């Protein structure tokens, strides 16, 4: 995964989201890539390209201790930045991310069980 980063950088030269993130993090580490809107309107926490790359790599390293490239990762996250970090962490680690909302306390677990049954062997993240 190597992208030639220079002033005439062309994103179409990147073949993966990770290559694109790495290029953007190298060119514009302080530029905001995500802003979380906790109430749907007011800007809350922001994340820069550099922060996203750093956090995702740290997560990928932890995944790498327990997984192999191509493993499936069931991602049980509510909406938010933690999901974004884990999703990119999966990509850095070569895992197949399978996002799903965590079940509510009063919710039937049938939907989640169906997802897990369809995946076979899987790791769960939350």
Each language-model region and where it sits:
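Acyl-group handling in specialized metabolite and lipid biosynthesis
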Residues: 5-13, 39-45
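A short N-terminal helical cap/helix-turn-helix that marks the beginning
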Residues: 11-35, 54
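Conserved AMP-binding/adenylate-forming core of the ANL superfamily
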Residues: 30-67, 71-88, 104-113
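Anion (oxyanion) recognition and catalysis
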Residues: 91
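Structured binding elements
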Residues: 94
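Conserved ATP-dependent adenylate/AMP-binding module captured primarily in the ANL superfamily
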Residues: 99-126
């Amino acid at each position: 995964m190597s992208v030639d980063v220079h002033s005439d950088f062309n994103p179409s030269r990147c073949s993966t989201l990770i290559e694109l993130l790495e290029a953007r993090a190298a060119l514009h580490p302080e530029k905001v890539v995500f802003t979380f809107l906790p109430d749907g309107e007011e800007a809350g926490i922001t994340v820069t390209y550099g922060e996203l790359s750093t956090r995702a790599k740290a997560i990928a390293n932890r995944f790498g201790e327990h997984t192999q490239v191509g493993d499936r990762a069931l991602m049980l996250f509510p909406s938010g930045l933690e999901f974004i970090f884990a999703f990119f962490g999966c990509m850095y680690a070569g895992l197949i991310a399978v996002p799903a909302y965590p079940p509510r306390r009063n919710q039937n677990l049938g939907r989640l069980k169906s997802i897990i049954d369809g995946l076979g062997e899987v790791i769960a993240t939350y």
